[in-house]
Structure formats: C-alpha cells, structure tokens
Amino acid sequence: MANQNSSNDLLVPGAAQAIDQMKLEIASEFGVNLGADTTSRANGSVGGEITKRLVSFAQQQMGGRVQ
C-alpha cells in the first residue's frame, strides 16, 4: 500500500496541543469566543493570526534566510 500523506498531518508530535493553546490565547486576545455561533470572519481572524505568528516564528528560527 502506498504511503499516503495529508497536508493536514502534523509532522511534530505534540504540535496539536501547542497550536490549540495558541488558538485559545489569540482568541482571548481578540475577544473572540470560538465556536459554531461565532462568525466566519471572527473565527478566520484567529486562524489568520496563527498563520502570521507561525510564519514569523519560522523566519526567526531560520535567521531570516530563505532556503
């Protein structure tokens, strides 16, 4: 059977908990109550901020150089 990878598979064990914690912290900072009753815009703002912070963290780890 072929090895099937999904782009949603986490490569680092324990990353899911760290990302969930980040999501809760950002939602709190933004005053967003995550859930089904929250607008897509509000929930999306949290996801967008997570992406910005993860990219920033990766850039810092790489010392600003692109590989």
UniProtKB/Swiss-Prot annotation:
Gene Ontology MF, one: double-stranded DNA binding
InterPro entries documented for this protein: SASP_alpha/beta-type, SASP_alpha/beta-type_CS, SASP_DNA-binding, SASP_sf_alpha/beta
UniProt keyword DNA-binding present: yes
Keywords: DNA-binding, Sporulation
TM region(s), chain numbering: none
Site, Cleavage: residue positions: E25, I26
Hydrolase in keyword set: no
Biological process according to GO: DNA topological change; sporulation resulting in formation of a cellular spore
Sequence similarity: Belongs to the alpha/beta-type SASP family.
Note: SASP are degraded in the first minutes of spore germination and provide amino acids for both new protein synthesis and metabolism.
PANTHER family referenced in this protein's UniProt entry, alphabetically: SMALL, ACID-SOLUBLE SPORE PROTEIN A (PTHR36107:SF1)
Known function: SASP are bound to spore DNA. They are double-stranded DNA-binding proteins that cause DNA to change to an a-like conformation. They protect the DNA backbone from chemical and enzymatic cleavage and are thus involved in dormant spore's high resistance to UV light.
Protein name per its UniProtKB record: Small, acid-soluble spore protein B
The species this protein was found in: Bacillus subtilis (strain 168)
